[in-house]
Amino acid sequence: MKIIEAREPPTMAETETYWKSLWGEESQHNERAEWIRREQERKVSHMCWMPIQITEITSYFSKAHNWKSPGNDQIQNYWLQALPATHRHITKNFNAIIEEPEKAPDWLTAGITYMIPKSGDSKEVRNYRPITCLTTMHKTLTGIIAKRIHTFGRQSLLPA
């Protein structure tokens, strides 16, 4: 493993300016693109949403890496595997958040971003890559949703 030392990292203002130039500007897609018309003409069933089941929570935690870096919640997957009594409460709260997303607690989507130096001049912002540690609860909720979308896509959208 090559260790790259950041002797003089860029300032917070330089970092924010750089990333806003890449991600901060809204862009418009071509609404008349041919692929959009083709997709609109396809007869695809809609994905019906069913409440998250406790079995999905338990299954997710059983496959999660025990000591992955947690976000602001500081919850390690190990404890969620070891304390199955929490799964019922997590299930209830996830379903409440899906029903009323505006009531989701701010900490759920908060992350800690670390700027990892790649190579080159450590003063240059472009020579860093951001790594964001999201909360364990956020990763769990989005992981369950992603699995459902993947299953739906495999069963309903992809050709047989």
PLM regions: where:
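Conserved pre-catalytic core of RNA-dependent polymerases
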Residues: Q28, W35-I36, Q40-A160
